[in-house]
């Protein structure tokens, strides 16, 4: 729940960057008085699926979806606001399957957490400053903006395969903060007694 200090509050935000292979998450605190965003936690959920020929693909897809939702359920519980980079469709059937499952998981999150803000991949890239921003550009932007953000490390270095999803989730918060819906939600919390 939001921590209240008079009319000013510290709101807990959870941000998501979802695909069937990786779910990047970032938890943050937004101070309504200073308008400062502090990244408190970063994590990536990567479903583990056994590669067995005897298991049907749709059963593997259900298992992936279960692992993704299970991994985000607890972090979502205490969030005042959830925002997500919503994936876009694709040409291949397999990619569309991933898209459908990802969007369904986000729809479930939006039902559980009505203060849900969706942003597009383009909005995320434009927040970094370029509609063609690479994953490395996004990570560099996050490190410059939030040097203490706990991006996942491997042997003391940023783990690019995990951190790219966490960085996208962090930038999604910044993109969400630019939306009218974010401002409406902040005003609703300020108006609460």
Which residues does each predicted region cover?
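Phosphate- and other anionic-substrate recognition elements at nucleic-acid/protein interfaces
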Residues: 2-193
């Amino acid at each position: 729940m939001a921590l209240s200090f008079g009319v000013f509050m510290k709101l807990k935000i959870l941000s998501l960057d979802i695909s069937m292979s990786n779910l990047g998450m970032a938890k943050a605190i937004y101070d309504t008085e200073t308008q400062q965003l502090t990244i408190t936690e970063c994590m990536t959920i990567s479903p583990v699926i056994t590669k067995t020929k005897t298991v049907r693909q749709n059963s593997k897809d259900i298992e992936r979806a279960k692992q993704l939702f299970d991994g985000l359920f607890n972090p979502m519980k205490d969030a005042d606001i959830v925002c997500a980079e919503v994936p876009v469709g694709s040409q291949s059937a397999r990619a569309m399957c991933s898209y459908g499952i990802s969007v369904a998981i986000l729809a479930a999150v939006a039902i559980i957490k009505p203060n849900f803000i969706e942003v597009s991949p383009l909005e995320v890239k434009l927040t970094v400053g370029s509609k063609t921003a690479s994953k490395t550009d996004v990570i560099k932007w996050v490190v410059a903006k939030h040097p203490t953000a706990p991006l996942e490390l491997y042997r003391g270095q940023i783990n690019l395969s995990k951190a790219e999803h966490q960085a996208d989730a962090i930038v999604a918060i910044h993109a969400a903060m630019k939306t009218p819906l974010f401002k409406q939600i902040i005003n609703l919390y300020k108006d609460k007694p």
